[in-house]
């Protein structure tokens, strides 16, 4: 597929919200920064549209560029923050199940926050963006085996954190 202005506009409408969601999770839910990064991402994609390999799904290419943008920002001292939004402390709890669900969510959020960046990125791309192992490998430019081992380590670390911090 050749990326014309019309096809690119359609791709922006389809994938722009996913890109912004990815940036939201990776920047601690900073809406303005996420919007700016999404705009920068699509400007970058347009400027390098001739490099797009139509054999790959567009979202894999898009997340590759997005991941590299974040990596470059990180090198400039920007830290990757939240995956799951914080629980609003002032929000009343309606039922015990909701409280339990929010506590689990908060615990997982804390566990994800403590992951080393390589594990966190793999985890977020898999569970936040629903990319396959193969797509994550392409996005991060690492072998599939490395993706699997990072995912295994991330899941074990999250599981261990939750076991240690579970309240009875």
What are these regions (language model features)?
Residues 1-21, 35, 46:
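A short, charge-rich alpha-helical start-of-domain segment used by transcription regulators
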Residues 16, 20, 42, 116, ...:
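C-terminal flanking helix
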Residues 16, 39-46, 56-79:
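Σ70-family region 2.3-2.4 aromatic/basic alpha-helix that recognizes the −10 promoter
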Residues 19, 23, 34-45, 65, ...:
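Short, small-hydrophobic-rich alpha-helical interface motif
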Residues 51-53, 64-84, 101, 153, ...:
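Arg/Lys-rich amphipathic alpha helix in sigma70-family domain 2
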Residues 72, 80-105, 132:
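Internal acidic/polar
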Residues 122-126:
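A short pre-motif secondary-structure segment
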Residues 134, 140-164:
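DNA-recognition helix of helix-turn-helix
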